[in-house]
Swiss-Prot record:
UniProt organism field: Homo sapiens
This protein's encoding gene: DORIP1
InterPro entries membership: C14orf28-like (IPR040029)
Subunit structure, as described in the record: Interacts with DRD1.
Job of this protein: Could be a regulator of the dopamine receptor signaling pathway.
Signal peptide extent: none
GO biological process: cAMP-mediated signaling; G protein-coupled dopamine receptor signaling pathway; gene expression; memory; neurogenesis; NMDA selective glutamate receptor signaling pathway
Annotated protein name in UniProt: Dopamine receptor-interacting protein 1
Length: 310
C-alpha cells in the first residue's frame, strides 16, 4: 500500500491537465474519533463515545506543510526529533501515511497544545474540541524552541541603566517597514530583525548609541522557519522572495498559509517536486495543482526550508 505522500507524487506525475485534483480528500476539516468501551465497562452508556473536532483549519494547513517538508527532506525527521521527540515524529508520519487524519490532529492537540488554547465541552455522548482562533496561536507558538532566536545589544554610554540587553524570541514576527522603501520589503524586514545595526538608545535621557549584534538561532539553524505575515497588507506583498538569508544560513520558499477573511478560514499552498498545490480541508476536492496563485486570499505565513549545504 502506498503512503499518502507517494499517492500525491504519483498523481502529479500522471496528471495530463484533464484533472488537476487529487483523487481523494486529504486531511478534511474537522473530524470524528470513535472510542469503543472495553468489555469490562459495566455502566458505560452508550457503548460508543465520540470525540468531535471543529474549526481545525487553524492547524490543518500547517500539518499538511509539516508532512510535505518531512517527506521532501530526508534528514529533517531526525533533526525535528531533537525538538519534538522521536516518538512524536514517527507517530505523526505514520498517521499521515495511513490516512489517519483525525488521529493525527488529536496527536497535535494533546501532545503540543496547552489545554487553554482550545475550547472543549461534553455534549451528550461526544467530547467536542473547538480550535477556532488564530493558526499562529494553535501551531506556530507550539513549535517548542525550534525557531528561538537571541540578539544582544550594548549601549555606548557607560551610565546607561540598561547598557547590556538581550532580546529572545520564540517565533519569527516581521513587521512591514514604517517607511515604504524601494526593494524587496520582506527581505528588508527580515534583515531588520536579524542583521547587526547601530541605533540611538531608547532609554530615557541616555543619548548613547546602541549596537545590536546579529540575531542568531539559540539551538542552531532549524530545518524550517515560519514567518508570521498576518500584519502585512496585500499591497506590500507584490513580491515574495524565493530565498532568504537568516543568520548566515540560506532558506528556500516551500509554502505558505492563506486566510479567507469572509469565511475566517485558513488554507495552505506548498510545492512538491517543483509543482505548487493548494490544500483546503473545507472543500470536497481539497488538494489541487495550481497554475496560478489562489485568488482573494490573504497571506498568513510564509514557510521556508533550510537549503542543503553542498
Amino acid at each position: 500500500m502506498k503512503t499518502l505522500f507517494e499517492e500525491i507524487k504519483a498523481s502529479i506525475k500522471n496528471n495530463y491537465n484533464q484533472d488537476r485534483s487529487f483523487c481523494r480528500p486529504v486531511l478534511p476539516w474537522g473530524g470524528v474519533f470513535t472510542i469503543k468501551a472495553g468489555r469490562k465497562a459495566v455502566s458505560c452508556t452508550p457503548l460508543y463515545v465520540e470525540i468531535r473536532l471543529k474549526n481545525t483549519c487553524t492547524i490543518d494547513g500547517f500539518l499538511m506543510l509539516l508532512y510535505v517538508i518531512l517527506n521532501e527532506n530526508e534528514n529533517f525527521p531526525r533533526e525535528l526529533s531533537l525538538h519534538f521527540g522521536r516518538e512524536f515524529v514517527d507517530c505523526f508520519l505514520y498517521l499521515m501515511d495511513t490516512y489517519s487524519f483525525t488521529t493525527v490532529k488529536l496527536l497535535w492537540i494533546w501532545d503540543k497544545m496547552e489545554k487553554q488554547q482550545y475550547k472543549s465541552e461534553v455534549h451528550k455522548a461526544s467530547l467536542i474540541i473547538d480550535l477556532f482562533g488564530n493558526e499562529h496561536d494553535n501551531f506556530t507558538k507550539n513549535l517548542e524552541n525550534l525557531m528561538s532566536t537571541i540578539q544582544e545589544s550594548y549601549c555606548s554610554n557607560w551610565r546607561c541603566p540598561t547598557r547590556v540587553q538581550e532580546d529572545q524570541q520564540r517565533t519569527i514576527n516581521i513587521n512591514p517597514p514604517q517607511e515604504i522603501p524601494h526593494g524587496n520589503l520582506i527581505r528588508l524586514a527580515v534583515n531588520e530583525l536579524f542583521c547587526s545595526k547601530i541605533e540611538l538608545c531608547e532609554e530615557h535621557g541616555c543619548g548613547g548609541l546602541r549596537e545590536f549584534s546579529q540575531r542568531i538561532f539559540c539551538h542552531g539553524a532549524p530545518p524550517f522557519v515560519v514567518l508570521n505575515m498576518q500584519h502585512w497588507k496585500s499591497e506590500d506583498l507584490a513580491y515574495v522572495p524565493y530565498y532568504l538569508d537568516l543568520s548566515d544560513h540560506k532558506y528556500l520558499l516551500e509554502g505558505a498559509t492563506l486566510f479567507n477573511k469572509e469565511e475566517h478560514h485558513y488554507s495552505a499552498a506548498f510545492q512538491i517536486g517543483g509543482h505548487w498545490m493548494h490544500y483546503d480541508g473545507l472543500r470536497n476536492v481539497n488538494l489541487i495543482l495550481l497554475n496560478k496563485p489562489p485568488e482573494f486570499l490573504l497571506l498568513s505565513s510564509l514557510v521556508y526550508i533550510r537549503a542543503t549545504e553542498k
